[in-house]
Amino acid sequence: TNFHAATRQAGMFSNAPDDNSLKTPYHASRMPTSSLPSATARHPLTVGPATVFSNNVRLFAYSGASMNTFDVVVIGGGPGGAKAAGILARGGKSVALVENSHLGGVCLNCGCIPTKLLLGATAPKGLLRGLERQRVAKGSIEVDYDALQKRIQRFIKGSAQALGKSLEQLGVTLIEGRAVCTGPTEVLVTNTDGSSQSLHAQHIILAGGSRSAAFPGMTPDHEAVLDSTDMLRIAAVPESLIVVGAGAIGLEMADFFSAMGSKVTIVEAAPHLAPTEDADVGLEMGKLLGKTGITCITGVKAASLTTSNGMATLALEDGRELTAAKALVAVGRTPNTDGLGAESAGCTLQARGYVTVDQCLMASPTVYAIGDINGQTLLAHAAEHQGAYVARHILGQQTTPYASGPIPSCVYGSLEIMRVGITARQALASGGKVEVARAQLMGNAIAQAGGDASGFVKIVWHNGALAGISALGHGVSHLVTAAQLLLLGQYHGDALHAFMFAHPTLDEALHAALEAPREVVTA
C-alpha cells in the first residue's frame, strides 16, 4: 500500500496535492534503528580503484560486498548534502555521500561562487563610474577575461578538493556515480565505469539540487541560446546579450557582461525587475540599471527564443523581435528528481517534480529531502540550514519541527538587493495593518564615500511588529546579517537603543530606516 495514500486517508496529510507542509511529521512512526544491521558490525569493505571527478576530487568506489550498509546514505554533494554528511559523521554515524557530478553542487561549480568571482572582478568598474560622476577620479580598468576564467576554475577545483578532503577526514565515504532509490532503505549506484553497487541505509537524504528551467519555445540549444552554466563558461564576452528573466541569476549575469562591454537587454514578463521584491525596489533597480546602459523591457512575455544564422532571436508577444549574439534563459529552476526513484522509496512528487516533505523535512518514514529538491527555498544557505537540521534530527538532537526563521536573500553586483523577512506585498496578502519606512542611502557617509549613494533601505511593519527589511544600492548585501539579527531580536522602538551601530558604517542606514516615519500602505 502506498504510504502517502494510507496516511492521507488517516488525516496525516493535507488534501492539497502540492501541500509542502504536512500535518504530522514522519518521525513519529519512523523505523527503529535497531531493525537494521549495525553499520559498525558490517563486513569489512575493500577499497577499489579510485575514481576522479572532473575537479580532481578523489571518490572511492567500493567493492568486496554485494550490499554496503551505512547508517545514512546522502544523495547529492552540494551545500545541503555535504553539511548533513559532515554533522552525521561527527555524530558517530556511518555515512556514504553519492555525487554524480561535482562536489559542492551548483553553488560552488556553476552558481553562487563563480558568479561572485566574476562580479568581484568588475566591481572596480562600478566604483570608478561613481567617482567619475563626482568628478574626483577618471581612468579605465581592463579585466582579462581569459585570466579571470582560469582563476575561477582554480578556485573551484581547490575548494572542491578541500571539501572532499574534509569529508573524508570525518569518515564520510565518498562515491562517484548516479544514485537511484530502489526501496525505502536501498540505493543503487551506477559508477562511472558502468559497474554498480547497492547501498543499504537506515536513512536516505535526498539532496540532489536543481538545474536551469526552460519553457516551451525557449529551450537552450547551447549555441546562441544559453543557460546559466553555459554563460559561466562562455569562451569570449559576446558583443550583445539578451537576458530573459530578471531574477537573481539574470540580474547578476546582466551586470557582469554589461561591465565587460556587452550591449545587454533584460526582458522580464513581470511589471518590474526582481519580481519577487516589492515594486518600488524593482522599479528603482530598472531606473538605475538604465543609467549604466542596460536596456530593461518589463511587462512583456517572450513568445520564442531561437538560434538563427548563429545569432539569438527573441520574439516578444507584443510583436517585437530582438536579436543578439547570445541569449541567456534565466527563468527559474527545476528539481533533479527525474530518474531518482524517489517514489520507490515511498516519496511523493508534486506536479513540478519537487519532493513533498513534512514538518521535519521527511518525505517518507526513512527518507528526508532537503534543499532545492523539496522546493521550499531555492538558496544554497537554506539547503545547508536544512541539512544541518536533518542531521541533528537523525542524531536525536533535534525533535521539534524544522523552522528556518527569516531567510536572508541577496542579488549581487554593482547594484545589489538585500532582503530578510517578508515584503509589503506579502504582508498585505496576509491581512492586518501594514506600514513601511525608508531611509535613502544618499544620507549615509559610507555610501557617499563609495562613489554611489543611490538606493534605500526599507522596513516593513506588520501589525506593529518588525516583519521585513530590504535594501537596494551599492554594497547593501553587507547589511543582510545585521538586518537578520535586528529582525530576529525585534529591535525597534525603545529596544533599538540596546543595539549600538558603529559610525560611520553602511549599517547606520538600517538604524535610520528603523527610526524613520512610518507610512500606512493599503495596496
Where are these regions (language model features)?
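Low-acidity, Ser/Thr- and Arg-rich intrinsically disordered low-complexity segments
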Residues: 8, 14, 21, 29-42, ...
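Beta1/beta-strand and adjacent pyrophosphate-binding region of the FAD-binding site
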Residues: 67-78, 239-244
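Glycine-rich flavin
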Residues: 68-70, 87-93, 98-237, 265, ...
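Short hydrophobic core segments
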Residues: 73-75, 179, 199-209, 244, ...
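Flexible, glycine-rich terminal cap/loop adjacent to redox cofactors
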Residues: 75-80, 84-101, 106, 113, ...
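Glycine-rich dinucleotide-binding loop and its adjacent helix/turn
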Residues: 112, 208-263, 267, 295-296, ...
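FAD-site-proximal beta/loop scaffold in flavoenzymes
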Residues: 221-238, 321-396, 482
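A conserved FAD-binding loop/helix module that cradles the flavin
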Residues: 284, 370-426, 503, 507-523
